[in-house]
């Protein structure tokens, strides 16, 4: 009986993995289906021109869908943006904050609000894409074959439906597969560009533009970089939490202790993404602008990859968003109040305000180290890309996303296997009884 249960659990895990792979294949297949009315040759030249801008980063996150202007061109970014906006608003807007406290019902309402906002953001972005495409004329001709109202309407509908389909597929992976669906869709998009980046590097080495020793050093550097990311992403500061003893009749209950883990990098990959988006926005405007403004050209030059001003601003913005997003993710006052509510306390700290201030003190130190870690991880690839013209798909943000998704998925698989073994053990105990 126990063997049959274990076999059933194992088959369920395999089915979940197969389902996840199947859905990800659908996502990749959709990224090669172009929207109607586009000149592929003219579009290719524009995509190549914007490789170093914010479009290059979003093209990387979409797995090349934006560069090919496929039905998944907007990728799942509108949904992520909507989720972040709702998360930010839940801190400042009281009704949303109250919804978060309503448990599962509140969570469903917040998810519904995120979907509505996703449709709105995707519609605005899709319309912006349609208008931009109509205004672009290359050496080979206009990008849009027959511009007009019909093209705008069909483009908006196609791109919005594509985003909502990706969002739904991501939810299906989360519910019926393994791992976080949204993260895995971004992950598969990023790694799809890795083979071309490796081929590009070897091509540069073959032509003599990149020495073989440098190519080997870059490969070794990638391995070291991934190891560093894994170390820092798994790093935690454990705070001792004590529960008081309670006497009920002649028996004494409680008195146990546990640990509250605080991640070194609480903010995750959000700070580099936000920082990159802000810094690369002027360069993107310049690429789409037909006028040769001196101010715009100067901004484009000084905010280019690897430039000193770009790096300084990049680090400053990463540090700022690290503190900003950590304050949203971890509410010190709320956590301290929850501990006091359950009778728990930090040894040596009074429950309430004193505990909250202690959390702030610890988080500030962790965030400084975490911000420096994120800055270093993101700057090193920037310098390499600037010097050796390595593809953007090997940027620091890419490494952070890929490693985080892999770690999260492996953790979920381990948790699933552990829970299956636990259920098997409990069933065995019940049978014996």
UniProtKB/Swiss-Prot annotation:
BP term (GO), one: protein targeting
Subcellular location: Cell inner membrane
Subunit structure of this chain's protein: Component of the Sec protein translocase complex. Heterotrimer consisting of SecY, SecE and SecG subunits. The heterotrimers can form oligomers, although 1 heterotrimer is thought to be able to translocate proteins. Interacts with the ribosome. Interacts with SecDF, and other proteins may be involved. Interacts with SecA.
Membrane topology type: Multi-pass membrane protein
Protein's UniProt name: Protein translocase subunit SecY
Gene Ontology cellular component list: plasma membrane
Protein family: Belongs to the SecY/SEC61-alpha family.
Gene coding for it: secY
Record's keyword annotation contains Cell inner membrane: yes
Keyword Membrane in annotation: yes
InterPro entries, A to Z: SecY, SecY/SEC61-alpha, SecY_CS, SecY_dom_sf
SUPFAM superfamilies in the record: Preprotein translocase SecY subunit
Transmembrane segments: 17-37, 71-91, 117-137, 141-161, 184-204, 212-232, 268-288, 309-329, 366-386, 388-408
Source organism phylogeny: Bacteria, Pseudomonadati, Pseudomonadota, Alphaproteobacteria, Rickettsiales
